[in-house]
């Protein structure tokens, strides 16, 4: 995913957190903030230290990014959102991560209306 699609700055993360607009399932928490004048969505990925060791956290982040790349054309473009992995996400296969992440994104209404 291109750098322009990522949220990297701490201040941007905090701005999205402070909206308190979140949904969750058992594996992921999604925070979102509408940005009407934005050309495309931006995403921040957070995998805390409770989620395994550094190798496992990197593995989970890569799987989340890959899933987002696969569903990118279907996502709303005028939003910033954060994906926070819960501890149980470390034990999932790629297929399970995709299923759970798509479920969380659906709960957050981040897919374009058909």
Swiss-Prot record:
Gene Ontology molecular function terms on file: 3'-tRNA processing endoribonuclease activity; ribonuclease P activity; tRNA binding
Catalytic reaction annotation: Endonucleolytic cleavage of RNA, removing 5'-extranucleotides from tRNA precursor
EC number: 3.1.26.5
Keywords recorded for this protein, A-Z: Endonuclease, Hydrolase, Nuclease, RNA-binding, tRNA processing
Any GO BP: tRNA 5'-leader removal
Transmembrane feature ranges: none
Cellular component terms (Gene Ontology): ribonuclease P complex
Quaternary structure and partners: Consists of a catalytic RNA component (M1 or rnpB) and a protein subunit.
Database matches in NCBIfam families: rnpA (TIGR00188)
Biological function: RNaseP catalyzes the removal of the 5'-leader sequence from pre-tRNA to produce the mature 5'-terminus. It can also cleave other RNA substrates such as 4.5S RNA. The protein component plays an auxiliary but essential role in vivo by binding to the 5'-leader sequence and broadening the substrate specificity of the ribozyme.
UniProt family annotation: Belongs to the RnpA family.
Protein name: Ribonuclease P protein component
Natural source organism: Limosilactobacillus fermentum (strain NBRC 3956 / LMG 18251) (Lactobacillus fermentum)
Gene: rnpA
């Amino acid at each position: 995913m291109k750098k322009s699609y990522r949220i990297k700055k701490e201040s941007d993360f905090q701005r999205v957190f402070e909206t308190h607009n979140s949904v969750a399932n058992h594996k992921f928490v999604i925070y979102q903030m509408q940005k009407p004048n934005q050309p495309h969505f931006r995403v921040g990925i957070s995998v805390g230290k409770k989620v395994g060791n550094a190798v496992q956290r990197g593995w989970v982040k890569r799987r989340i990014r890959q899933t987002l790349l696969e569903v990118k054309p279907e996502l709303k473009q005028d939003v910033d959102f954060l994906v926070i992995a819960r501890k149980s996400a470390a034990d999932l296969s790629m297929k399970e991560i995709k299923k759970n992440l798509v479920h969380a994104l659906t709960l957050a209404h981040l897919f374009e209306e058909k």
